[in-house]
Structure formats: C-alpha cells, structure tokens
C-alpha cells in the first residue's frame, strides 16, 4: 500500500512539474538566491536540474509501483524525501526579518536580509501550498517511505508478478485518476501513467536479461523525455496560472473591494532601539499606534526606521493578477485601454528581448499585418525599456508598437520566449509559443 500511494503521488507530482518545467526552474532560482540557500553557481543549471528532478520523480514513482530495482529505488526515494523534508522545514521556518552573512564575489563577508520562498512549488501552480503545508506533506511521505525501505532491504519487494502487478498498477491508476480529477481538474495524469506503465510492462515481457529492469527504466525515461520535450518547446499542456485560456484578465485584476470581498490585513514592521540594552526591537504598526504615546515607550525607545517589511496579519482575497502593466514610452500605464479594447488583441510577449531576438518574428509580422488590416489591435510587450523596444521594432520591421512590463509578470503570462497571446474583451482566447505562431486565416476560420 505504501508503494502504491507514494509511487502514485510521485508520478503526479513529477508530471505536474514536468508540465511546467520552466515554472519549476523559476522556483529553483528563488532557492538559489543569496538571501535563500545562497547557491548562485547553480542558477545556470536551473533548467537542467528542473528537468532531472521532474523525470526522476516520475521514474521513481513508476519503479516503486512495479517493484523495479527495489533497493536503488527505495534508497533514492529515501534520500529525495529527506532532502525535500529538510527543504520545506527550512522554508517554513524562514524568518523574513532576520539577516544572514554571505561571501560575495569579491570574497568579502556581507550581511543581507533573508529571502523567504513563499511556496515550495511541489505541485506547481496547480495546488499552491504554504511552506508549512508542504513540510507536513513531506513529513507524511517520509513516514510512508520507511516501510518501502524496510521491504526493499529485507527482500520483500521484487519485480511484480503478473497478478500482483495488475492489482498494484490498477490501484495506482485509480489513485492517480482520483487525484487528477478531484484536485487538479485534469485527467491527463492517468493517461500518462497508463502509457508509462504499459511501456514498462511491455519491455518486461519482451526482455528477460539481467538488465531487464534497466531497460524498463530507459523506456519510461523516453516517455517522460518526449512529454518534457513537447512542453519545453511549445507550452504547458495544462495552464494553472491567471493568464490561462478562458481567464479574464480584467476580472483577475480586480481588488477585494471591487468584488465585495474581505481583503487580507497587513501591518508594517517598525524598528526601534531599546535605550537601555541598545538592542533593536521590531514593533508592528498596529501595535505601535497603541503605545506610541505611552511614557514608558517614549522614554525607553528611540526610532530607527519606519520603512520595514509588510507583515500579513490575516488572510483574505487578493487579486490573482497584481503587477500586469503595459507602459508606453512616456511612462504611462495604458493597461486599461488595451484590456477594454472592444475586439481582438494580439500581444507579442517577450520576457527577455535579447534572448528571444528575432525568433518567430517573420511569422509574427505577417500575422500582425493581416490582423491590423482587419481592425485588430497588435502590440509587443517586453521587459526592455522604450529605446530598446524601438530599436528592436526597427531592426525586425515589426508593424506594431512595443510596451514595457515587469519581467516576472511576463514569465507568468506565457512560458515561451517569445510567445503570443490572443485576447478578446480582456479574456484570453489562446496562447502560442513562437514556434507555433498561427496564420491569420486559422484564427478567423
């Protein structure tokens, strides 16, 4: 039962991350920041690590259920769970007000503020978990891994016989289907798992050498690799972000007040120095307003800073989209004008104008020319300033104007760099990678 549950969850978890390996890469980059784990040397390998973890997690899940390479599978699962449990514990206990010492590029010691990762990315954007929730989840999985280790090293686990395999694989598919349909609103995981199991079982029947289990593993890796290749070169199969097809950007930008909902409550962290001990003390603005006129406070503390971090006191509705801007050359945000345009809008999105320079531009120009002649609005939206946008537009003969937006938000809008977004009345109609830019005729058919 432990093999079935842990293996099935590994398959689902790995597939969700593999579906959006770029998003998982961004999460790894957060962990590598100096204020977090301080591993800047790994940033250039973030995508490779993302793919390795995604495929490795699926492979371990399949191997657990079918009983392949039990000692190796159990050991790697134990190591992985120990690491993930430590990481989520570290994340859950991160103090945003604390500082840490790091050694910078010059070799000097520098004190910087902690950078706390707010979500672990275990299930991508599909199931956002707080660090504490992620830690509890990993703790439970770690406990379930213990019987798997015991069974593997006592010789109780082996490659499934036909009857046992049928029971375990069927049970796993039921668990994956229930998880996918109930929590992910996505039935693809059960299809993917069925294909992976079919490949593994087919190779088990086809080969009888001592390397059979390694050949089965290779087959599953090929299945994972093909899926990963598709999502990296096109777009995620399932999009859980607020810019997904069918989502209204207008509605997702509305505040709690606009929707008649209760918003979260925040306070600002103020810093004061105790005159007697000379130690700094953090006092929240909501508490400060109650004591700032008290004689003991006036006499015992002096102000250091009112510019502290914001602290959430209570949860509430927060806009799904908060930082989407369309800034023109004069520094004006024209986002409302674009979103309220009555008709169709095509947005050429580039999170990194230099890295995506010219990719798909010929197809984009042809599409834009036809679309604009039919009254569509077409714009470019990049991370670059106005002058760089204008240079790009001139160099590649783009017939549409370019605007600027925050790079982090552009990464959320579309994973491909560049990518294309089609909106109508503020609602996302479709998105494409630069490799898949359509012709205008296909849009109006």
Annotate the PLM regions.
Residues 13-53:
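Solvent-exposed, well-ordered loop and adjacent helix/strand elements within mature globular domains
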Residues 1-6, 72-77, 212-218:
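Alpha-helical transmembrane segments and their helix-start/interface "positive-inside/aromatic belt" motifs
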Residues 165-186, 191-240:
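Internal/C-terminal transmembrane anchor helices
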Residues 54-182:
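Hydrophobic alpha-helical segments
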Residues 1, 150-159, 202-208:
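Membrane-interface junctions at the ends of membrane-embedded or membrane-associated helices
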Residues 1-18:
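N-terminal signal-anchor transmembrane alpha helix
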Residues 238-445:
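Extracytosolic and intramembrane catalytic regions of membrane-associated proteins
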């Amino acid at each position: 039962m432990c093999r079935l549950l842990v293996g099935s969850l590994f398959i689902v978890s790995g597939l969700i991350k593999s579906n959006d390996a770029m998003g998982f890469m961004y999460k790894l980059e957060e962990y590598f920041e100096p204020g977090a784990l301080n591993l800047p040397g790994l940033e250039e390998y973030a995508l490779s690590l993302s793919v390795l973890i995604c495929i490795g997690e699926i492979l371990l899940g399949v191997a657990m259920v079918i009983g392949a390479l039990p000692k190796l599978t159990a050991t790697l699962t134990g190591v992985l769970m120990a690491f993930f449990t430590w990481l989520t514990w570290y994340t859950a206990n991160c103090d945003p007000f604390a500082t840490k010492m790091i050694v910078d590029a010059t070799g000097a010691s520098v004190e910087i503020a902690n950078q706390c990762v707010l979500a672990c990315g275990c299930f991508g954007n599909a199931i956002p978990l707080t660090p504490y929730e992620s830690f509890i989840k990993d703790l439970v999985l770690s406990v379930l891994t213990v019987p798997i280790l015991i069974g593997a090293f006592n010789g109780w686990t082996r490659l499934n016989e036909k009857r046992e395999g049928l029971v375990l694989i069927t049970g796993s598919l039921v668990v994956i289907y229930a998880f996918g349909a109930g929590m992910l609103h996505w039935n693809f995981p059960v299809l993917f798992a069925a294909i992976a199991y079919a490949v593994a079982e087919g190779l088990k029947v086809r080969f009888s050498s001592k390397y059979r289990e390694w050949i089965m593993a290779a087959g599953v890796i090929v299945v994972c690799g093909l899926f990963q290749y598709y999502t990296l070169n096109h777009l995620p199969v399932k999009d859980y972000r607020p810019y997904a097809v069918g989502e209204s950007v207008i509605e997702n930008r509305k505040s709690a007040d606009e929707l008649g909902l209760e918003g979260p409550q925040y306070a600002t962290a103020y810093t004061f120095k105790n005159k007697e001990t000379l130690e700094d003390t953090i006092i929240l603005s909501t508490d400060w307003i109650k004591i700032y006129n008290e004689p003991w406070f006036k006499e015992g503390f002096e102000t250091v800073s009112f510019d502290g971090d914001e602290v959430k006191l209570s949860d509430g509705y927060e806009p799904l989209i908060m930082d989407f801007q369309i800034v023109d050359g004069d520094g004006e945000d024209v986002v409302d004008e674009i979103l309220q345009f009555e008709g169709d809008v095509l947005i050429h999105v580039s999170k990194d104008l230099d890295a995506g320079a010219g990719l798909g531009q010929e197809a984009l120009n042809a599409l834009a020319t036809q679309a604009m002649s039919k009254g569509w609005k077409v714009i470019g939206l990049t991370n670059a300033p106005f002058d760089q946008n204008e240079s790009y537009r001139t160099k590649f003969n783009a017939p549409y104007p370019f605007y600027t937006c925050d790079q982090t938000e552009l990464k959320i809008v579309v994973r491909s760099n560049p990518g294309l977004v089609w909106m109508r009345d503020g609602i996302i109609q479709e998105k494409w990678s630069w490799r898949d830019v359509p012709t205008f005729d296909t849009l109006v058919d």
